[in-house]
């Protein structure tokens, strides 16, 4: 019930978050060399959005890997999300359920390091050149780069991949994410240039994160092509370190390390991908998954529910030391996990109503009774980072906010929103009294046994969740408080596939969604909060936000030339979003809870910005003799 909670998987439904992150988006991307128009661009092994990359030319490996890690063994994992089956290998289309681990087959021009926020190092590219005017970036491809079929990776493949991802055959999030990249231009067979619609310091990194696949993927023997959005179980042709060895009934899949993998000796790959095989077994629900782990059926359990960590992740194998439990600090930033309100529904359009719903949520009781004190309340869209707004707006924020004053709640110019608290001297009763006053001011009063508007219509809505969720006790507690206000909140569950479809169609009133944290906000913020995405089916603008003021702050964020300007824009955005009460913020943890077999080992130096599953797959290894 933390950051990786149920809806984290749902928001990755189209493959956008998973695929772009797999392509190097987390640390973002990198770029190549080549001459531009007037002045020659400077070629480099890596780039950073601000300042210089941490690792210099000629570096041997990242600090958080073990360059001497032994190779071999099999890593067995369970469902990394709520999906209990898969029906495709293509992670770049909207429909269907993606096979877990499929990102192991693909690479991008560049990849980020996990111990710095916004840099990118050559992967498929061996150098990168950003134009002096910042309006393009050129990548030169490593001549050794090969796809799994043995073909060299060419500029034509890069352009084909980019053009496909921006087309209607790919999930719409890609077109949104790459919107400011106007085109990919083939300079020569080994060189590709990306041209931008405007200057933005992150765009070279974003271009470097474009996933690359072969033009032959989906090509039939007779030369005709299977439409990209119809590719399902056709073997992907990527350049990544693993191949699909076998799969069964959409429930199990085994990856084998490619013995001819071209990039094993690259500095960005040394000490990584140490397992000979990686197996995913998909279980029907969380109970079956946990019991299978305790029975020794798979090797690593990443626990997202604090109560389970204390009460259920126990037993004789833990007592004997065969299974080990550890918490690992991470600095990813909490992002926003909360009960998201769908502004497309009329009952949620008044900010006073939304604030009242926030006042009815008793986090402190939940943390004591259900979570064993394992969480911290979210109070920002950028919590646990320097991107979070605090106090009153500073001079840089005011410079952005003042021109928007007429469009904003005056409260935005005062102290930052403080989440309601029920610890003494606060109380749930006091919060509900405030909520009742806000609802009355918005035209909702209690009569005839329910909260009603001027037309006599009762205040009702549905809280949507997936059938395998552990959120029911949380929802029941929230329902109880809402009922005291006269609000009828119904709890509805759906299987994961149906849930995905409903989210894509914005067919929900309220649902728990997690928007992952970032260290350097970029296009994902436009996709989440930009007005033009509010009506685009399958977009990440889950709340349906249409705000010219927010659009203006997003534009300022995109135009930031320095880290200071980025902070001012993000603080202002955070302040406006929080004062809008578009979500009832839930909670976060600053650690990854990981239980694992003692036959596994990991580097002693931890990365800073990482997912637990990705870290295990990419840098752990099997102890020799096991």
Predicted regions and their residues:
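Detector for C-terminal structural segments
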Residues: 46, 79-81, 96-97, 101, ...
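Aromatic- and charge-enriched surface segment that lines or borders ligand/interaction sites
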Residues: 65-70, 92-99, 127-171, 187, ...
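Gly/Pro-rich hinge or "lid" segments in bacterial periplasmic/extracellular proteins
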Residues: 100-116, 208-277, 284-288, 295, ...
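Surface-exposed binding/hinge segments that line
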Residues: 140, 175-222, 241-248, 392-405
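Ligand-site clamp/hinge motif
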Residues: 142, 230, 261-313, 355, ...
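Extracellular/periplasmic solute-recognition and catalytic clefts
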Residues: 183-186, 245-256, 281-345, 352-356, ...
